[in-house]
Amino acid sequence: MLQKLMSVFLTERSTAILQIKYKSNTIQLKTDSVPLAEYHKPVYLLCDQKTFSAGEGFAMILQNRKRAMVIGETTAGAGNISGPYVVNDSFVITIPVGVINDVLTGKGWEGSGVVPDVAVKSNDALAKAIEIIQKKR
């Protein structure tokens, strides 16, 4: 699903954006060859420590490609793929089974999160984004 969303904002078609490394194999997620829609205007993403998983991937991919400005706080840093394993009838654990990295940088967001381009407290992020947009007009 993330690659479908990325296809709206990135102009490259059928291009690898993420690499997922599992114990036995590696796969790449690519942008769609034909996107559902296209959006070419500036993008401003508001993030904080509650932004995690695919939300972080979305922010990192656009940020690394200079396609969006990330405003707010560093994200949660939850980037590994996990899977549930049944221990017994009443106990299930979730453990990491794959690591995700941006193919452009070779780095992921697990443990480190996505660091914003403009760091402000979460409550101030929207006002800061509006200020930045108004200055660019």
Identify what each model region corresponds to.
Residues 1-46, 50, 80-83, 97-103, ...:
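Gly/Ser/Thr-rich loop/hinge elements
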Residues 50-53, 66-79:
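Short, well-structured beta-strand/strand-turn elements
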Residues 107-137:
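Low-complexity, Gly/Ser/Thr/Pro-rich intrinsically disordered linker/tail segments
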Residues 2-7, 40-43, 55-59, 63, ...:
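Extracytoplasmic/secreted envelope proteins and their assembly/folding machinery
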